Regions:
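Hydrophobic alpha-helix-in-membranes signature
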Residues: 12, 16, 165, 169-170, ...
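Metal-dependent polysaccharide deacetylase catalytic core of the NodB/CE4 family, i.e.
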Residues: 71-74, 84-86, 91, 95-209, ...
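Catalytic grooves of carbohydrate-active enzymes
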Residues: 219-256
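Short catalytic/ligand-binding loop motif for oxyanion handling, primarily in non-cytosolic enzymes
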Residues: 175-178, 233-234, 261-263
């Protein structure tokens, strides 16, 4: 037995254990379900774009102003699904401060609040497409995606006599590249964001102080801010926040400026 063990030790080559291969990330295809996020920082720099979103520009997608690096311009955008009195307060502040906003609306918001939509338009704000029904667009077929955009387009035209601005934002940031290809085909730029925070739950609102700190800590030149206009906190802090940011040298731009549409 000792002889056999000795022979085996000679015949079997000595080597280090083979290291396990690192796990590979699944390839992102046009049909991969994605959820928007960015890698924020506290140095007031444009957040880093995660690798899975590297194709964004190919689909006419935006999340921050990368065309004017370092310029202290901000973009206020609001996802408006319904009204609880605070959308009107937000509009009052924007009018008082002479600041433009972009409102991404649903069909329900338009049918329930036609006067507010007319006010947005008459006061120079951009009214944009947040889809007709606020579905998870990562699960939508090409045809369903197309209908979500065109149904709201048609309703908007019927109710206002105007065309909705060709800016699209996926509900809850859920999407797949196939969606954005359809949006691009229909003439839309897709607008994500570089800053958002937990402001949507009416029964779990952040305190005004905490909200201002969160925004100020994460602000950066070229930021696209996503705010929910139903938020009581947002309605309270917006006048102060605008003054604060303007005093720090920021100004507020429009989505046409962000995307370069006004320059075309």
């Amino acid at each position: 037995m000792k002889l056999i063990a000795c022979l085996l030790s000679i015949l079997i080559p000595l080597s280090s254990p083979v290291a396990a291969l690192p796990p590979t990330q699944a390839a992102v295809t046009e049909n991969t379900a994605l959820r928007w996020y960015v890698k924020r920082n506290l140095e007031h720099r444009v957040p880093e774009l995660p690798a899975e979103f590297s194709s964004l520009a190919e689909y006419d997608g935006y999340y921050a102003d990368l065309n004017h690096p370092g310029e202290k311009v901000l973009y206020l955008t609001f996802d408006a699904g319904y009204e609880n009195g605070n959308v009107e307060r937000i509009l009052n502040t924007l009018k008082e401060k002479n600041v433009p906003g972009a409102f991404f609306i649903l069909s329900h918001f338009l049918t329930a609040n036609p006067a507010l939509v007319e006010r947005m338009l008459s006061e120079g704000h951009t009214v944009c497409n947040h889809t007709a029904r606020h579905r998870n667009m990562a699960r939508a077929s090409d045809g369903e995606m197309r209908r979500e955009l065109t149904d709201l387009e048609t309703l908007f035209r019927e109710r206002t006599g105007r065309e909705i601005a060709k800016y699209y934002r996926p509900p809850e940031g859920s999407f797949k590249w196939e969606n954005l290809a359809v949006a691009k085909e229909l003439g839309y730029d897709t607008v994500f964001w570089s800053f958002a925070y937990a402001d949507w739950a009416n029964d779990r609102q952040p305190s005004p102080d905490a909200a201002v700190k969160k925004i100020r800590d994460n602000i950066h030149p070229g930021a696209v801010l996503l705010l929910h206009p139903t938020s009581e906190t947002n309605a309270k802090i917006l006048p102060y926040l605008i003054d604060l940011l303007q005093n720090e040298g920021y100004r507020f731009g429009t989505l046409d400026e962000l995307t370069g549409r006004r320059e075309k």
